[in-house]
Amino acid sequence: MAPNLRKSHPLLKMINNSLIDLPTPSNISVWWNFGSLLGICLLTQIMTGLLLAAHYTADTTLAFSSVAHTCRNVQYGWLIRNLHANGASFFFICIYFHIGRGFYYGSYLYKETWNTGVILLLTLMATAFVGYVLPWGQMSFWGATVITNLFSAVPYIGQSLVEWAWGGFSVDNPTLTRFFTLHFLLPFAIAGITLIHLTFLHESGSNNPLGIISSCDKIPFHPYFSLKDILGFTCMFLPLTTLALFSPNLLGDPENFTPANPLVTPPHIKPEWYFLFAYAILRSIPYKLGGVLALAASVRVLFLCPLLHKSKQRLTTLRPLSQLLFWTLTANPFILTWVGSQPVEHPFIIIGQLASITYFTIILILFPITQTLENKMLKY
């Protein structure tokens, strides 16, 4: 009998063990679909990005025109650009859902998988930020100026860091060139870290909605979950293509249709919607260094989740007090996102400050206290 090539060939065997015969808990729900959706988002972004890079010119005098040229003169250039710009939004929607699921079902207890996931989030945020600068519109230019200027808050070496990032004494041609280089390179770094993320995941096995060991009840990934993932792809691509075709600029900023002008400041400088929660936390502290530290902590606090877990149960499902806190925490970034999109004036300042305090208090203080209390109530 001839050996099964899928199981004997060195390369095919790796693919087979990761995507076909992978033992998967039989009861994982639709919340486990977001990992594969993130993979397809990354693939889509790399493909559309490579096509856009072929027509883009990383020069301050030509960048805006080259983007306009791509949309007007390149065959289906408008569609490729719209898919790339809105694909970034869907990428962040998927990753926020993915993190939320990990938080709710206690997946952060797989420490290595969780920590590489947080590194992936930080890399994705860096990639999206440098990408937003490339069209060289007003919001691109001023967003780059404001955010890179935050490095000046670093004691002693701050100003040198800023000038090193800019490649001069202001945001100019060298800045755009290095941002384009980073935006081209980082997605491949994300792909590499994703492989590490999956290696750690397959080492421990996937979590499940019951939070129990599922070794006795596993089924092959294909065809059961591969078909389920294809349904997920369809459910994601339908709204993405609808948005790209019917309302491509819905999530963008009108200021970015104006070429960058260093002499005219927009009335309200703000990043893309998926960064607004962190931007609101940055703005809530009135001095620069404190704001920068809070901005960094808003994402890096996720590294502490495995250390702050005090419950004897893995899941939040059977812990009503923790559930209440979880859904309060879920509502919090929506409030921060709304505040971040508003001008810096009363009452948005105080709302942002209260929401920022609530965000850190829930994660760092209330979750551990509540979990300890629940342990005592359940007599663990």
Curated annotation (Swiss-Prot):
SUPFAM superfamilies associated with the record: a domain/subunit of cytochrome bc1 complex (Ubiquinol-cytochrome c reductase), Transmembrane di-heme cytochromes
UniProt entry keywords in alphabetical sequence: Electron transport, Heme, Iron, Membrane, Metal-binding, Mitochondrion, Mitochondrion inner membrane, Respiratory chain, Transmembrane, Transmembrane helix, Transport, Ubiquinone
Cofactor(s) annotated in UniProt: heme b
Subcellular location as annotated: Mitochondrion inner membrane
Membrane topology: Multi-pass membrane protein
Cofactor: binding comment: Binds 2 heme b groups non-covalently.
Top-level division of the source organism's lineage: Eukaryota
Transmembrane segments: 34-54, 78-99, 114-134, 179-199, 227-247, 289-309, 321-341, 348-368
Biological-process GO terms, alphabetical: mitochondrial electron transport, ubiquinol to cytochrome c
Predominant place of localization: mitochondrion
GO MF terms held by the record: metal ion binding; ubiquinol-cytochrome-c reductase activity
PANTHER family in alphabetical order: CYTOCHROME B (PTHR19271:SF16)
Misc. remarks from the entry: Heme 1 (or BL or b562) is low-potential and absorbs at about 562 nm, and heme 2 (or BH or b566) is high-potential and absorbs at about 566 nm.
Oligomer status and interactors: The cytochrome bc1 complex contains 11 subunits: 3 respiratory subunits (MT-CYB, CYC1 and UQCRFS1), 2 core proteins (UQCRC1 and UQCRC2) and 6 low-molecular weight proteins (UQCRH/QCR6, UQCRB/QCR7, UQCRQ/QCR8, UQCR10/QCR9, UQCR11/QCR10 and a cleavage product of UQCRFS1). This cytochrome bc1 complex then forms a dimer.
Name by which UniProt lists this protein: Cytochrome b
Species per Swiss-Prot/TrEMBL record: Colius striatus (Speckled mousebird)
Lineage of origin: Eukaryota, Metazoa, Chordata, Craniata, Vertebrata
